[in-house]
A protein has these predicted regions:
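Residues at the starts of beta-strands that form the adenosine-phosphate
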Residues: 2, 26-28, 96-97
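SDR active-site strand-loop-helix element
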Residues: 6, 30, 75, 98-103
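N-terminal Rossmann-fold cofactor-binding loop
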Residues: 30-35, 53-54
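Short, hydrophobic beta-strand segments that form beta-sheet elements in well-ordered domains
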Residues: 26-31, 72
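N-terminal Rossmann NAD(P)H-binding glycine-rich loop of SDR-like oxidoreductase domains
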Residues: 3-25
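Short, glycine/serine-rich, charged loops/turns that create anion-binding
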Residues: 10, 32-34, 105
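Conserved Rossmann-fold NAD(P)-dependent oxidoreductase catalytic core, especially the SDR/UDP-sugar
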Residues: 84-133, 137-140
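NAD(P)H-binding glycine-rich loop region in Rossmannoid oxidoreductase-like domains
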Residues: 39-93, 106-114
Length: 140
């Protein structure tokens, strides 16, 4: 299976990508610039690295589709507009999963920790949290 990771060189991607490669996934790492992962695991040398900027490339979705991913892991989607572009752009394709990385900011303050997201009042903390929450709802 081919997995495309958007925002691959950040904290989560640094550790996720070697696990995917080590488990036999063909992995494509998308970053806006040639950023190095926090740790240079040997698995990173088996990864195809692609420079692509969703905010500044009007053909982002088409270029993403051309990679023919089975799974997309989106670690840097910050607004509902981008979520909808992915969902609409990949409708009817062979995409098996779209994994969207949300944020605790989408849920608001918790009275107890750890918290159950189903028990929260869903009062996002700011615009970032509101956008993440809107994407959460859109993807359900």
């Amino acid at each position: 299976m081919r997995v495309v990771i958007i925002g691959a060189a950040g904290h989560i991607g640094t550790y996720l990508i070697p696990m995917l490669v080590d488990n036999g996934y063909e992995t494509i790492a998308i970053t806006r610039k040639m950023s190095m992962p926090y740790e240079d695991a040997p698995a990173w040398h088996k990864v195809k690295r692609v420079l692509l900027d969703r905010e500044n490339d009007s053909e982002f979705i088409e270029k993403l589709k051309a990679m023919e991913p089975d799974i997309i892991v989106d670690l840097v989607n910050f607004n509902i507009k981008e979520t909808k572009k992915i969902v609409e752009g990949f409708g009817g394709t062979g995409l098996f999963h779209y994994l969207y990385c949300s944020s605790c900011w989408a849920h608001g303050m918790a009275e107890t920790i750890p918290f159950n997201t189903d028990d929260l009042g869903k009062e996002p903390l700011d615009k970032y949290g509101k956008d993440k929450y809107a994407s959460d709802i859109n993807l359900k």
